[in-house]
Amino acid sequence: MRLTDYTDYSLRVMLYLAVHGEGLATIQEISDAYGISKNHLMKVVQRLGELGWVDTVRGRNGGLRLFPASLRLTVGEVVRATEADFALVGCFAADGDSRGCVIEPQCRLKGVLAAARDAFFAELDRHTLGELAAPASSLVSLLGIRPIAVVRAEPAAAGSAEPPSKAD
């Protein structure tokens, strides 16, 4: 079974945002980190937003962030939501468009392949995005995410209501 690029990119966006933490990331940053087309990512991000997994903030200072509950999503949930087809062979087709096979009435291969697919999803369902994003420090450096520097303002001196004076 091979996942589509769309699903691959969806998982990558979700992992990037999970590692990114607080603050907003941009599609351009994610594109640069993975070397993926920005246009492809725009489609992916739109869908992730529609699913309610990613908060998309529009505007000049906009960007993306993962909703906290999304860290509890399993890889299987993401794959199921972003893949269109899990038919491993023609006789699995759900839309009735199966290719006729002369051995279908006696075929045991279909059951073996169905069990393999189910085992694949069982494994994906064991892992959450939050689990895969930890420890974030190793992924942060690989993805080129720069930590946000927090600058704390100095408290004003007690009894002083005036701002600090400039040195002449």
Label for each model-derived stretch:
Residues 18-22, 68-69:
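Short helix-capping/hinge SLiMs at alpha-helix to coil transitions
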Residues 52-61, 65-67:
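Beta-hairpin "wing" of winged helix-turn-helix
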Residues 13-20, 81:
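Short amphipathic alpha-helical elements of helix-turn-helix/winged-helix folds
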Residues 27-34:
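A short alpha-helical element within helix-turn-helix/winged-helix DNA-binding domains
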Residues 39:
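Key DNA-contact positions within bacterial/archaeal DNA-binding proteins
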Residues 14, 45-46:
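Short, hydrophobic-biased segments on the C-terminal half of alpha helices
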Residues 75, 93-168:
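C-terminal regulatory/oligomerization modules of transcriptional regulators
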